[in-house]
Amino acid sequence: MLTFLIPTAKEMTIPKESHPHLLPQDSQAILKIMAAMTTEDLAKAYRIKEEAAKKEQQRWQDMASQKSLAYPAYQLFNGLMYRHIKRDKLTTQEQAYLTQQVYITSSFYGIIPANHPIAEHRHDFHTRIKIEGQSLKSYWRPCYNQFAKEHPQVISLLSSEFDDVFSKDCKQLWISPKFMAEKEGQFKTHSTISKKARGAFLTACMENNCQTVDSLKSLVFAGFYYHPDLSTDHEFVYIKKEA
């Protein structure tokens, strides 16, 4: 069975379905630090203006006082990649695929199933804090490595910020899809192409119930197709021709 890892997103939208917020044990230490920070501290940690930091401070304090509601993560996150993932009117098989084979990597919650209930928050591995004297990446590395050992065949749709959260020896069977546009024989890639394509790729995997590495090679989605000559065992390249 294939396991997919996808990143979080800064952009969020509140879905209809809500749950009580139950925070994993490993996240408690992070919450304690974040909830105690001033708006000035948060502005520095996030590299944002203090006005924007006030909103984040309220979110952390609401979590600490157990006032926060939680929402299925794949519905709450609404960045460009998420908007290109099929999230509504799923078949029973697609719903099972999304909730059993797709996991979200978070610097606050750890690695969670796509439908895990989470609260509104802003947090990533660039957030400037120390947890028990460690960087966020060092703090989460044992948890992330354990997940990798339990799920050896991972399809990673993660961005570069996650490259050194996992230890290298845990990623021997990983495959990272790469998405490129071709125009007049020239190949190019950029953030917008990649984010949209990640969502479309995951949707195609769900719709086709892909369970093997070879099945990924026959996918055609949003104009992209697998390019064997540019691909390697660990990087599958998908090309979309532009006019």
UniProtKB/Swiss-Prot annotation:
GO terms for cellular component: cytosol. It comes from the Bacteria. GO terms for biological process: response to hydroperoxide. Pfam families: H2O2_YaaD (PF03883). NCBIfam families: PRK02101.1-4. HAMAP family: UPF0246. Belongs to the UPF0246 family. This is UPF0246 protein SpyM3_1790. It comes from Streptococcus pyogenes serotype M3 (strain ATCC BAA-595 / MGAS315).
